[in-house]
Each structure stands twice: as structure tokens, then as C-alpha cells.
Amino acid sequence: MEISMTSHINNAVETFRLEIETLEKLKNSIDENFEKACEIILENNRDKSRVIITGMGKSGHIGKKMAATFASTGTPAFFVHPGEAGHGDFGMITKNDVLIAISNSGTSSEIMGLLPMIKHLDIPIIAITSNPKSILARNSNVTLNLHVDKEACPLNLAPTSSTTATLVLGDALAIALLKAKNFSEKDFAFSHPNGALGRKLILKVENIMRKGNEIPIVKPTDNIRKAILEISDKGVGNTLVAENNTLLGIFTDGDLRRMFEAESFNSQRAISEVMTKNPKSISKEEMAITALEKMEKYEITSLAVVDNGHNILGIVTMHDLIKLELR
């Protein structure tokens, strides 16, 4: 039987409509139980507890995402599969933790099987379910009712509206906790060290600068030929000029090109005669993004890294910073 494109679109729109209705109903039902759930988590977090999230099937998939969102927004959390918990993983849960148990029906046999041990630990249980009279709800400290009467699935079988509601409720909890803890952009960066924001807010110059034998350095009495060899060897595009490791100047490949264009080029001249004195530098404690901004401002491709006495500690290059994708 041929199905028209219009039918596909109508089915999609109907799915959106049903799930949006579910979310509207959930939004309008948020009450003091949501407040209690947040307070339970915040109170236990003061004792460095974790939020343990469990759920079976599609609820479990949503639970994994919920745990990941909690963990990345300042609430330590991880997912425990209820089936595996019954075969050893229950040992991951401690008496200081808080459990969020997800079951739309509130009767998941795997979660029911864990209730005696959870009660034995005497840890707070937050139930997420559409059945406030279920065994799970009756054994919980607080129940967050999803209020899902019908799935978007026309068979009313595949978890659709219920999983969407659970996902959004989890996000609502995470954001409420984030705001309660005054979780900042910098805090977020620490939990995302490999992301662009993390690198921007965490990486310092000392973390990415070239050190030791990687630093191109010549003495002021060395000739231009020696400087050219140093530039070629270190591949930075310039060489620092230093006396007893104190920064005096810099000689770049741009300086070299301009000298070649002059009629009186002499590779035996002392580098001190042609170097740029008092070059731009930066402290190792500065942020990497600051080094990038400084290079862009002065239209240069590297910065000497020095201490308060102008002693050379390293060199940071535009090329290295671009590879970090700080923006």
C-alpha cells in the first residue's frame, strides 16, 4: 500500500503534538515534590554523596543521559543498571548516596528486586514514574509524577512521551541544582577539560609553551647565519636573543626576508645589530587565550615566556594555539 508524503508529515506532526502536550502537562504539574527532590540531593551533596540513577530499558537509556548531565553540571552522578546491580554492581552504591529510580509504570521487576537492599542502606529514593500509587512510589521518599497517560506511539506501547518527559524532567532537575550551587562557566570548564570552553578557561601558557631544547635561542654575539640555522632547526619562525638566559631581543623570518631584499646583506653581522629589542612577552601564569589575543593585537606569531626577571622560560606560538581551537 502506497503511503503519501503528506501522511508521513501528518504522523510526525501528531507525534510532536502528543509529546508537547505531555510536556505542557508535566510543566503545569511541577509542585513541592520537585522542591523536595532538589533539597534531598543538595543536602546529601554537602556530605560529598553521589546521585545514583537507575532504570530499565528505555528508561535506562534516559537515565544514562540524566547522569551525564548531572555530572557535567556540578552534581556528581552515575548510572547503575538495575540488572547488573543484582549481580555485584550494587556495591557501587554507598549509604551516603541518593537514588533516582526511573520506571514509568513503577513496577519494573528489576528495580523491585533492588528495593530491599536499597531500604537496607537507608538512602533517600526519588521515584520518577507515572504511577504515584505504585510499589516504587510507595517505597520512595519523594515521587516525581510524569503524568503520562498515553504514549505518542499509536499502539501505546513504545516508550515515547514517557521517555521525553523523563528526559526533560532530568534536565529541569540538573538546571535547578546548577543554579542552587551557583555553578559557573569556569566550573563547567573543569568538567569539560577537552572542550573548547574548558581549554579556554583552564589552559595556561605554561601548559602549552615550548620548553628546554625546543626554544630557539642565540647569543647577541652570534652572527645572522647562526640565527638562521636556529630558526630552521627549531621551526618556530624566529629565534630569541638572550644573554645568560635573559631576554634581549628577537629575530624573525620576516626580518630575514627584509634583509635579503636589502643590497648590503651580510650573514656575518652580529644578531644584536639587527634584532628587535624588548620583544613582546608573557608570563607562564597567563591564560592561553590571553596569549592568542595578545598575538592578534600586535600581529605577531609568537611570544617569549619570561619570569619577573625577564629570564626565558619558554616560547608559545600562534600555530600551537590555533591547534587548540580555543575559539
Swiss-Prot record:
Q: Which residues form the SIS domain?
A: 41-183
Q: In which pathway does it act?
A: Carbohydrate biosynthesis; 3-deoxy-D-manno-octulosonate biosynthesis; 3-deoxy-D-manno-octulosonate from D-ribulose 5-phosphate: step 1/3; Bacterial outer membrane biogenesis; lipopolysaccharide biosynthesis
| Protein EC | 5.3.1.13
Top-rank EC class of the record's enzyme: isomerase
- Show the PROSITE patterns listed in the entry: CBS, SIS
Q: Tell me which UniProt keywords the record has, alphabetically.
A: Carbohydrate metabolism, CBS domain, Isomerase, Lipopolysaccharide biosynthesis, Metal-binding, Repeat, Zinc
Positions contributing to Zn(2+) binding: H81
Q: Where does substrate bind?
A: 74-75, 81, 87, 113-122, 147-149, 221, 273
Instruction: Output the GO biological process annotations, alphabetical, semicolon-separated.
Output: lipopolysaccharide biosynthetic process
Q: Which GO terms describe its molecular function?
A: arabinose-5-phosphate isomerase activity; carbohydrate derivative binding; metal ion binding
Query: Its family?
Result: Belongs to the SIS family. GutQ/KpsF subfamily.
Q: What is this protein called?
A: Arabinose 5-phosphate isomerase KdsD
From what organism does this protein derive? Francisella tularensis subsp. tularensis (strain SCHU S4 / Schu 4)
